[in-house]
Amino acid sequence: MSWKTEEVESHIPVMLKEFLKHCSPKRDEQWIDGTFGYGGHTTALLDKGCKVLALDTDEDAQKRAEILKEKGEEFYFFRKNFSEMAEACFQMGWTAVDGILLDLGVSLGQLKDPKRGFSFQFPDAPLDMRMDRTRERTGAALLNTLSKEQLVQLFSVACNMKESQKLANEIVRFRSTGPIKKVGDFLEIVTRARLLKSKINAATRPFLALRIAVNEELEHLEKALREGTKLLKGGGRIAVISFHSAEDRIVKEFMRSHCLPKKGEGVAEEENHREMFFYKVERVLVSLEERKNNPRSRSARLRIAWKIPLEEKSGL
């Protein structure tokens, strides 16, 4: 039986081939898909015979999951952030899992929906940017209420210090004449800030920084890495697909700092106190073919870490 729905068939999951090749999910394994979205990675796991517990905060993702749940009993969905995976596993009675996948960032559906305010392609849209619309804080609310110093800190996640200061100054100037409400208001602020020219649209990095702040994405990622690692069985793997340097830096540092050194390598003094969870870490870049067929994937990178088997860990 194929688990794919019509909507999943039309969606292209990022780095799916690489994920399946390097993680090798097997029949009857228990997997967590922390970012269900359109269900592309989940259905691939189900087609391999895995049991899948999926999470997503988006109500549209929940509707897609309900359709998938009608197909069988190997799929379970929770409308929660992936940082709450331990709680979801507890509710399911899952004490440990074979694998975890996190496909970070905003989905194509969220970007294309004008009401969500994620894209600068829709200037008349409300500046919302919430992945979970039950949350109160919108992008507009943050820009209207944060202090100048807090705004500089917000934008420094994706912009350099000079650009962050320019943006903060223009936001304070703009809101002195009236509240920021629409995507177009933020675009006007970016234009006034006269950021340094680059190959990408000048609004790309400011929009990214604001979205990260609205959804507390980096905080949730750090918690998910800690909690997820505890849930992994010995030999289990955690795979994270990231799209920008702030995310990737967190994933890289977490996996590297908790991985056994390679043969012949020593351990830095500051790392002696850290518990080692992993015996192997890999980085996989997106293929040229996928970059050509799916431009959204051009900045994607996949990092995978394998947990130390219990028998090996007991001998450390």
From Swiss-Prot:
Stored SUPFAM superfamilies: Putative methyltransferase TM0872, insert domain (SSF81799), S-adenosyl-L-methionine-dependent methyltransferases (SSF53335)
GO cellular component labels: cytoplasm
Coarse class of the protein's main subcellular location: cytoplasm
One BP term from GO: rRNA base methylation
EC id: 2.1.1.199
Gene Ontology MF term list: rRNA (cytosine-N4-)-methyltransferase activity
Localization: Cytoplasm
Domain of life: Bacteria
Keyword list, A-Z: Cytoplasm, Methyltransferase, rRNA processing, S-adenosyl-L-methionine, Transferase
Catalytic activity: cytidine(1402) in 16S rRNA + S-adenosyl-L-methionine = N(4)-methylcytidine(1402) in 16S rRNA + S-adenosyl-L-homocysteine + H(+)
Top-level enzyme category: transferase
Function summary: Specifically methylates the N4 position of cytidine in position 1402 (C1402) of 16S rRNA.
NCBIfam families on file: 16S rRNA (cytosine(1402)-N(4))-methyltransferase RsmH
Protein name (record): Ribosomal RNA small subunit methyltransferase H
Encoding gene per record: rsmH
